[in-house]
């Protein structure tokens, strides 16, 4: 999942939990973690 930016409900982290979507965005050096049950 490649995003233009990490959404406000998401956060930048080197490791996301299994309940989250692992995404990439230019404003995160590592991963952008987004809760899988959220609409964004």
UniProtKB/Swiss-Prot annotation:
- Recorded family membership: Belongs to the transferrin family.
| Disulphide-bridged cysteine pairs | 6-33, 12-28, 16-32
What InterPro entries is this protein classified in? Answer: Meleagrin/Cygnin
Keyword Transcription regulation in the entry? The reply is no
Q: What is this protein called?
A: Meleagrin
Provide the positions where the record notes the PTM Pyrrolidone carboxylic acid: 1
Q: Which Pfam families match?
A: Meleagrin (PF08189)
Q: Which UniProt keywords apply?
A: Disulfide bond, Pyrrolidone carboxylic acid
């Amino acid at each position: 999942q490649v995003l233009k930016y990490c959404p406000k409900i998401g956060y930048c982290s080197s490791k996301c939990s299994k309940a989250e979507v692992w995404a990439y965005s230019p404003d995160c050096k590592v991963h952008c973690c987004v809760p899988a049950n959220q609409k964004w």
